[in-house]
């Protein structure tokens, strides 16, 4: 009983931290738009400045009285940018400026964003230790057993050694977000051993906003069974 209780408490603390992060005024729910920058300078209602850009470089011209982070009036070149980009604060929000394969973007986050105020919660399946699986990392794939069968999921190695997995399963589009969910696994040990905790399967940002750009699961990362663990489809109120 003590072990189950400790497991449930740890999961609950993780879930509450996850919800707090989603509700943050600099989080995914706070995004008010995504702007793809082109050669012609444009001004947008939800972020200061006149914007243009190409490839991995953005250009912003700020008028008198406008500022972004430490940038004041004048023309500023931001780049070369990567996918993480930079974040520049302004009165009432934050401007994320980043590179994408289609060119640079500016993506404002504002405390008054409609999605942030409409968000209710992300329901979950009950935490269940039975959805924790021993696994091994072999040739770019996480290998584990479920109901007597072996399954493999392609994984990417993060900078800190942990494994990032995008997957679909029989709940996708039914009780969980249709496109995919994600998992972050502990870094494998010297013999490749790790662990999958499906209770911590989370939604990608595109489950919360139309202004996110998300990858898709690799071919073969659709599990043939229902993973009744982790996050379900987010709930929003009608405003």
Where is each model-derived feature located?
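Extended, aromatic/histidine-rich regions of cofactor-dependent oxidoreductases associated
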Residues: 193, 201-239
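Surface-exposed beta-loop interaction hotspot
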Residues: 89-145
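Forkhead-associated
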Residues: 37-82, 185
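Acidic/His-leaning functional-site neighborhoods
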Residues: 145-189, 199
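N-terminal beta-hairpin/loop module of FHA
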Residues: 15, 19-48
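Broad, structure-driven detector of short, well-ordered beta-strand segments within folded domains
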Residues: 48-54, 93-99, 151-155
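Actinobacteria-biased recognition of intrinsically disordered, low-complexity terminal regions
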Residues: 1-9, 16, 239
């Amino acid at each position: 009983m003590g072990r189950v209780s400790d497991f449930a408490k740890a999961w609950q603390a993780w879930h509450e931290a996850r919800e707090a992060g989603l509700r943050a005024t600099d989080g995914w729910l706070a995004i008010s738009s995504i702007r793809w920058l082109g050669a012609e300078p444009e001004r947008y209602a939800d972020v200061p400045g006149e914007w243009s850009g190409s490839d991995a470089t953005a250009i912003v011209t700020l008028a008198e009285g406008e500022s972004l982070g430490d940038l004041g009036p004048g023309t500023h070149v931001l780049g070369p940018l990567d996918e993480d980009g930079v974040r520049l604060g302004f009165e009432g929000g934050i401007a994320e400026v980043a590179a994408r394969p289609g060119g640079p973007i500016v993506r404002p986050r504002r405390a008054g964003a409609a999605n942030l105020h409409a968000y209710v919660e992300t329901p979950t399946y009950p935490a269940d230790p039975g959805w924790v699986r021993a696994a091994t990392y072999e040739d770019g794939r996480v290998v584990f057993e479920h109901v007597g069968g072996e399954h493999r999921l392609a994984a990417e190695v993060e900078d800190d050694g942990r494994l990032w997995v995008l997957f679909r399963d029989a709940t996708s589009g039914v009780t969980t977000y249709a496109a995919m969910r994600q998992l972050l696994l502990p870094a494998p040990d010297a013999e490749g051993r790790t662990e999958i905790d499906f209770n911590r399967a989370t939604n990608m940002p595109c489950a919360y906003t139309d202004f996110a750009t998300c990858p898709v699961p690799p071919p073969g990362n659709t599990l043939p069974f229902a993973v009744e663990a982790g996050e379900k489809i987010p709930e929003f109120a009608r405003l």
